[in-house]
């Protein structure tokens, strides 16, 4: 029985992880569940899965949870608890599915504690990739990616010599606004941006998909995960979401991971690696119904997020921190109705153009850069609100 700590158990990835654990209750047990403030869902999960420990990072929500919780799990409150709970002896594997750089310190602590690691948090590598890779190398930890694209790349590299890689082909669905012009995007609302054509995801990830900032984050993530130069990472649009990503080798061979879009598949593989279990949905591709596989290049003039991601990544140091933090602030402002959809790109571009990259030397340096980038982005947002 493998004991799993699910950090972010009430979110989109977290609930689908719990689905996988439910399907394979003979193999897995959720020894730890953790959420920010979704305590009703957390209470339901506690009743069903009987964890040994529960973490609520929001203080107020944690206090409210304790008022009605009558189970026997250890209840820990506050963000710092995430970094403590991953060290528990009753944890074999940590799946990090919290949002934002909140995931960085628990990831580092899980590696230091010798735990298996499944990573679903893009920001951890985008902001702190240098730190995470250094610790992973030191402790001989294999980072198992949960993102469908990075899982696909990971699977396409199994048994291959990394020196033989020519290029990573990172696929994107194109989001709800694929093929739109700048003029057509000028009046986009939050409701419009939440209509993803393929995946059912949380709000932040769905909005990032609409702007293609998610793909920008994934470019930087792929660089760190697989040690591939930015010039050898190419984004392509595959609107059917059948090809989840590909690896092209120096002899011209392309290895691809293809399958129906179901996030439980990469989650399950991260938990069972190197073994495979039956499909959670028991659904398979019916090739007789697929007349063609569509491939296109992304419009990097409309979706400047991709160009900005490459720029941020090539800055090295804390360029990724600035990219991520300014995007998060811009998304918040868009949701609040303070800026337009297209202004999201402007805020990140302005932040990066005024950014002087510094080395990432510690967790504290990441937090410092994050605060600086948010302040800079907020200043640009304020000007756009005038």
Regions found by a protein language model. Give the residues of each.
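Catalytic, metal-anchored helix/loop core of enzyme active sites in primary metabolism
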Residues: 1-386
